[in-house]
């Protein structure tokens, strides 16, 4: 298991402990990827997981670029359309630095 896969597993477990339900992991399209798809109450939650072993280059949260946000939004839109879902959604970020987990709800 790669570090990225370990981080995604840790993020999934953490979010499940917070009351979210797991739907799918690593949804890939030619134009973008969604790390985790979760459900929280009425929301479909698209989660980006960022991992850094230390606070290098600004930390995990700063590693999310505007271009990457655009690709995630496009992938989420395609996911909703392809699954024929007309539901509210949000975009969360789980930032993992060493052993610290930070969950940003409705991050972008």
Swiss-Prot record:
Transmembrane segments: none annotated. CDD domains: PoNe_Nuclease. GO terms for molecular function: nucleic acid binding. InterPro entries: Restrct_endonuc-II-like, tRNA_endonuc-like_dom_sf, UPF0102_YraN-like. It comes from the Bacteria. Belongs to the UPF0102 family. PANTHER family: UPF0102 PROTEIN YRAN (PTHR34039:SF1). This is UPF0102 protein SO_0299.
């Amino acid at each position: 298991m790669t570090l990225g896969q370990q981080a995604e597993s840790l993020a999934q477990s953490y979010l499940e402990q917070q009351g979210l339900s797991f739907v799918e992991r690593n949804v890939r399209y030619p134009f973008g990827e969604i790390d985790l798809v979760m459900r929280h109450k009425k929301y479909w939650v698209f989660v980006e997981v960022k991992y850094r072993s230390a606070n290098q280059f600004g930390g995990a949260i700063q590693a999310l670029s505007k271009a990457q946000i655009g690709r995630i939004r496009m992938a989420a839109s395609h996911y909703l359309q392809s699954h024929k879902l007309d539901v509210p959604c949000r975009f969360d970020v789980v930032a993992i630095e060493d052993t610290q987990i930070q969950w940003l709800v409705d991050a972008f």
